[in-house]
Amino acid sequence: MKIAIVMTLLLVAFSTASFAIEPIERAALDLVMARADSGGDAGGDAGADDEGSCKWMFQSCEPPAKCCDGWTCYKGRCNLILGR
């Protein structure tokens, strides 16, 4: 009986860890990609409010707002589109 309980707890722990890996990787990738694509501007804020410019991560947006290529407005922030 003890072995069954331990095995169940291990299964739950590994399942939880495997489900958490993808969001953690996505968040880390968003941070890296935002800095790599920003053209030397670490914050990505330069010219974001100018006409015709795109918005970067950590900048608020509305769904019709133009985020940069490969990015989408989701939950009020520009996010990288994964799986392209």
Swiss-Prot record:
GO terms for cellular component: extracellular region. Expressed by the venom gland. Its main location: secreted. Residues 21-35 form a propeptide. The modification Leucine amide is found at residue 82. GO terms for molecular function: sodium channel regulator activity; toxin activity. Residues 1-20 form the signal peptide. Keywords: Amidation, Disulfide bond, Ion channel impairing toxin, Knottin, Neurotoxin, Secreted, Signal, Toxin, Voltage-gated sodium channel impairing toxin. It comes from the Eukaryota. Disulfide bonds join 54-68, 61-73, 67-78. It is found in: Secreted. Weakly nhibits voltage-gated sodium channels Nav1.7/SCN9A. High concentration of the toxin (3 uM) inhibits Nav1.7/SCN9A currents by 79%. Belongs to the neurotoxin 10 (Hwtx-1) family. The presence of a 'disulfide through disulfide knot' structurally defines this protein as a knottin. This is Mu-Sparatoxin-Hp1. It comes from Heteropoda pingtungensis.
